[in-house]
Amino acid sequence: MGKTSDRLDEQHLAEEQVKDAVRPPSMYKVILINDDYTPMEFVIDVLQKFFSYDVERATQLMLRVHYQGKAVCGIYTAEVAETKAVHVNRYARENEHPLLCTLEKA
C-alpha cells in the first residue's frame, strides 16, 4: 500500500510541475502616449514601421492617440513588448520628437 501511495504522490507532483512549466507567458500592452509636439505623420510612420500597420489602420490609431490621449498598438510577450517600446522611444528621440511609448500589463 505504501508503494502505490508514493507513486500517486510522485505522479501528482509531476503533473503540478508540468502545469507550472506550461503556464502561458504574461502579456503586455504597448501604448503610445499623446503629446502636443509630435507630428501626426510621424506617429503614422511609427505605427507602420514598428507595428506593421497599413496606412489606414495606422491613421485610425494615430487619431485615437490624438483625441483620447493614448492608444494600444499591440499586445505582446514581455520581451517583445519591451523591445518595441525601446525601439519606438529611441526612434522618436533620434528624430527629436517627445513621443512616448509605454508598457502596461494586459
UniProtKB/Swiss-Prot annotation:
Q: Which InterPro entries match?
A: ClpS (IPR022935), ClpS_core (IPR003769), Ribosomal_bL12_C/ClpS-like (IPR014719)
Q: Which Gene3D superfamilies match?
A: 3.30.1390.10
Using the record, list the residue span of the signal peptide; answer none if the entry has no such feature.
Answer: none
- Gene Ontology terms: biological process: protein catabolic process; proteolysis
Q: Which Pfam families match?
A: ClpS (PF02617)
Identify its protein family.
Answer: Belongs to the ClpS family.
Q: Which NCBIfam families match?
A: PRK00033.1-3, PRK00033.1-5
Tell me the function of this protein: Involved in the modulation of the specificity of the ClpAP-mediated ATP-dependent protein degradation.
Q: How does it assemble?
A: Binds to the N-terminal domain of the chaperone ClpA.
Name it: ATP-dependent Clp protease adapter protein ClpS
Natural source organism: Sodalis glossinidius (strain morsitans)
